[in-house]
């Protein structure tokens, strides 16, 4: 009897631990750095990866920089080669947690939570604290956030020739539809 009980308990623990992880590989992220009266500077990314540990509230988000798509190919080229230097800094990431996270309090009613952690971009890592909205429906957790960062905080230099055309306060929108990991 004990020989049967141990494997069953190990299986139950493994299943329980596996159910606390939520993942996505198709999250979306967009940014906008437009200035009034100039051409819009905006891009979207639809292959953002994220992992949420629903037991602890730990969150990790990763976006490959070359995944951002612009309305114009030339903008995309300038972004990758001149500003963000994606050949040197191929990833942007967030690693942190949801403060006071309680997975039992999640529901289909949107709730505001605070994310704290480190944002890494362009070879620079900075502490960040932003607000997000979280909901849960069946096996899905949706997490959305809107915040801004300064290009100068991450060592992103904008040439003086176009400095007036690009807002140095970049507005970022993130939307993650996280599915329970099986």
Residues covered by each model-derived region:
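Bacterial Sec-dependent N-terminal signal peptides
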Residues: 1-21
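Low-complexity, acidic/polar, glycine-enriched regions of mature
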Residues: 18-182
